[in-house]
Design a protein with these regions (language model features):
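Long, distal/terminal scaffolding or interaction modules
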Residues: 1-222
Length: 222
């Protein structure tokens, strides 16, 4: 059990020159932020990446102000819940987000670190295969569970949530470690195959049904 070996991050960045993104203006359409998970040669390649917004296409630098040069360490400031897929498939990159995020935060992450100082919508940390995710807020349904197009939950990695998580969370977990400080919704931890889960708050209905192996710690006696 390796939870104690996971270093919890501080809120201040210690990177020398991280890439910092901030929206230039308020948005009204959803943005697919999965482009941040690409392997860019330098920050100029990132800023020139074409993304869709509404029914048009823009370069990243047209929607976001960008500064810094370390593309392995990214900070997003003033994030909003219209920004989906941040850290999706992330591999060997660290992303820190200040604000709320949309759907599929860290979905199928491979390695690296994701830190969120805000709330996440559904499917956060779904199907992750490695790395560490820290959510210092609440997270929606299917957190740490199956992706919206698959049937496998957490394969490996570490997930920490400071607040509450929603229904159908941490389903079909295969390996990894999870800590939930708050409450957990209905139909959670079902069909667990292995891994370790700590839940400090209350648990919902139909909890840990079909569990085969693994360890769950909870204070809720029901």
């Amino acid at each position: 059990w390796k939870i104690r070996a996971i270093p919890f991050p501080s809120k201040e960045s210690h990177e020398m020159n991280p890439v910092i993104l901030k929206l230039k203006k308020k948005i009204k359409y959803r943005i697919d932020m999965s482009f941040l998970s690409n392997a860019y040669k330098d920050a100029s390649k990132l800023s020139s990446q074409i993304i869709s917004y509404g029914n048009k296409q823009f370069k990243v630098k047209e929607l976001f102000s960008i500064k810094g040069s370390d593309i392995k360490n990214i900070i997003i400031k003033s994030s909003v819940d219209l920004m989906d897929n941040i850290g999706k498939g992330l591999n060997n990159i660290n992303i820190t987000v200040h604000g709320n995020v949309g759907y599929s935060f860290g979905e199928q992450m491979l390695s690296g670190k994701l830190i969120l100082y805000g709330n996440a919508l559904d499917y956060a940390a779904s199907g992750i295969k490695g790395g560490s995710i820290f959510i210092y807020g609440n997270s929606g349904d299917y957190t740490g569970g199956k992706t919206n197009h698959g049937n496998i939950g957490i394969v490996d990695g570490f997930l920490y949530v400071k607040g509450n998580i929603g229904n159908n969370s941490i389903e079909r977990m295969r390996r990894g470690n999870v800590i939930i400080e708050g409450n957990i919704g209905d139909y959670a931890c079902n069909d667990m195959l292995s891994g370790t889960i700590i839940i400090k708050g209350k648990i919902g209905k139909i909890f840990a049904e079909g569990i085969k192996r693994g360890t769950i710690f909870t204070k809720d006696k029901k």
